[in-house]
């Protein structure tokens, strides 16, 4: 994508850890992704907090002059928020409301390395795409092979007949932020939805790129 060409995405939700991991490569990847969002003029939606990978990417995007929205359950604020918080913070009641709000605000999703919470958020967005609840791109930044085993598990699911081959393609993965964003910019869904997009309460989940061109 040329420097003067605007991304198809206006806001992307990034799932990532409230820890930085043991190796610097993970912190570098969070900053690299932040740089890509700034370069493409994409606002950030994330899980709130100013520590770990969450803090690194939120500060980078904010310092780049773009909008940052952190969505965090009230119960997690004392744990995840420490030091200076940048951008806007929206406090919600629980984890379910958090994910719904993130999905409503963003036009696509990216998961950086993280723990159970990051993986759960990623898998829920994949599932929602499979079900037809949203038509938003789901990206996985596979830093230094962190998610190799998870991707292999998806392949096993296809081989054993639990995941349809088309649904395996819901996840767009790449080892670097630049490559991932390039693939996400070009991504077109190829899987069949379990139910129609219109049959869900999609107004609660916001717009997706291209929705404005859909015939009425």
Curated annotation (Swiss-Prot):
It is found in: Cytoplasm; Nucleus. GO terms for molecular function: cytokinin riboside 5'-monophosphate phosphoribohydrolase activity; protein homodimerization activity. It holds the Pfam family Lysine_decarbox. One of its GO terms (cellular component) is nucleus. The keyword Hydrolase applies. Cytokinin-activating enzyme working in the direct activation pathway. Phosphoribohydrolase that converts inactive cytokinin nucleotides to the biologically active free-base forms. Disruption phenotype: No visible phenotype under normal growth conditions; due to the redundancy with other LOG proteins. The gene is LOG8. Signal peptide: none annotated. Optimum pH is 7.0. This is Cytokinin riboside 5'-monophosphate phosphoribohydrolase LOG8. Its EC number is 3.2.2.n1. The keyword Cell inner membrane does not apply. Expressed in roots and shoots. Detected in the root quiescent center and vasculature, in cotyledons, hypocotyls, stems, leaves, stomata, axillary buds, flowers and fruit abscission zones. Belongs to the LOG family. Substrate binds at residues 80, 98-99, 115-121, 127. GO terms for biological process: cytokinin biosynthetic process. Keywords: Cytokinin biosynthesis, Cytoplasm, Hydrolase, Nucleus. It is an enzyme of class 3 (hydrolase). It catalyses: N(6)-(dimethylallyl)adenosine 5'-phosphate + H2O = N(6)-dimethylallyladenine + D-ribose 5-phosphate; 9-ribosyl-trans-zeatin 5'-phosphate + H2O = trans-zeatin + D-ribose 5-phosphate. Its main location: cytoplasm.
